[in-house]
């Protein structure tokens, strides 16, 4: 089945494509690469493009989308584009200007989904990760329920079709869901999710509240300087590799297919054209229920993206069980 057709309904009536293209790349990757990679992704069949202000490449991704609309490959309504509100803009008066800046960079009139990237607020300003002289994060104190009300206003104004969150734990989701006067529920919670961190408790909770779980770092995580270098490489896992041989697929495809069959929307991040084309093949086969159980058994609650620089803040999400 092709990736354009497989969509999941959100609790506000809109639909999200089950497989998305992740646009994040480490700083050392030239920004121009985002243009080519996004074009390749759209050519390969990706229609769900996951962006963020934090990635500093929304202009480039926007150029790619614009060029694929201009050359007739897609129409705007074929594309599901996500952007994210960064931690420097969680004060309610900063939410709409942040979204408007992303729209300007993306050259779009609206995004399909706008999400709160991280529940910890840091000092507003141009610097993504403001630090004091000791190298500690400069936090801000923000009422996330007020931030959410500003997100709701963005949806009502037509700047985004849907609104959601990312990196929220159960307690933080409940805080939004139980907010007096809640107008729009979050449609999704985008979190790190892969066979080593399968998020089964959070997934069950989200399903019970009609919130879609979206998986980032679904293939483990690239060897970045801020990732613990001693952590095991997911795609080299012997069980995953044996299963890949059995299905005549790559370990990456097994990891992506695993999420699709659990009802998780999954992001595949690659700037390599061959792998981009390969990742859309996640729709071309099915894992047996026995093999799904085997993959469930790989869980070891291993989080690659700990974002420990935020750990001193009361809203740091990863201290709770889930």
From Swiss-Prot:
Domain of life per record: Eukaryota
Record keyword Cell inner membrane present: no
Q: Which GO terms describe its cellular component?
A: cytoplasm
What are the protein's GO molecular function terms?
A: oxidoreductase activity
Q: Does the keyword Cytoplasm apply?
A: yes
* Conditions for induction: Detected at low levels in preovulatory follicles. Up-regulated in preovulatory follicles during luteinization 12 to 36 hours after stimulation with human chorionic gonadotropin. Up-regulated in granulosa cells 12 to 39 hours after stimulation with human chorionic gonadotropin. Detected at low levels in corpora lutea. Detected at constant low levels in theca interna.
SUPFAM superfamilies assigned to the protein according to its UniProt record, in alphabetical order: NAD(P)-linked oxidoreductase
Quote the EC number: 1.1.1.-
- Residue numbers binding substrate: 31, 117
InterPro entries in alphabetical order: AKR, AKR1C, Aldo/ket_reductase_CS, NADP_OxRdtase_dom, NADP_OxRdtase_dom_sf
Task: Tell me a GO biological process for this protein.
Answer: steroid metabolic process
Which residues are tagged with the site Lowers pKa of active site Tyr?
84
Residues given in the record as NADP(+) binding sites = 20-24, 50, 166-167, 190, 216-221, 269-279
Its subcellular locations are:
Cytoplasm
Active-site residues per Swiss-Prot or TrEMBL entry: 55 (proton donor)
Q: In which tissues is it expressed?
A: Detected in follicle granulosa cells (at protein level). Detected in heart, lung, liver, kidney, stomach, uterus, testis, skeletal muscle and granulosa cells of the follicle wall.
Which UniProt keywords are present, listed alphabetically?
A: Cytoplasm, Lipid metabolism, NADP, Oxidoreductase, Steroid metabolism
Q: What does this protein do?
A: NADP-dependent oxidoreductase that has 20-alpha-hydroxysteroid dehydrogenase activity.
Q: What does the sequence similarity comment in the record state about its family?
A: Belongs to the aldo/keto reductase family.
Binding partners and assembly: Monomer.
Protein's UniProt name: Aldo-keto reductase family 1 member C23
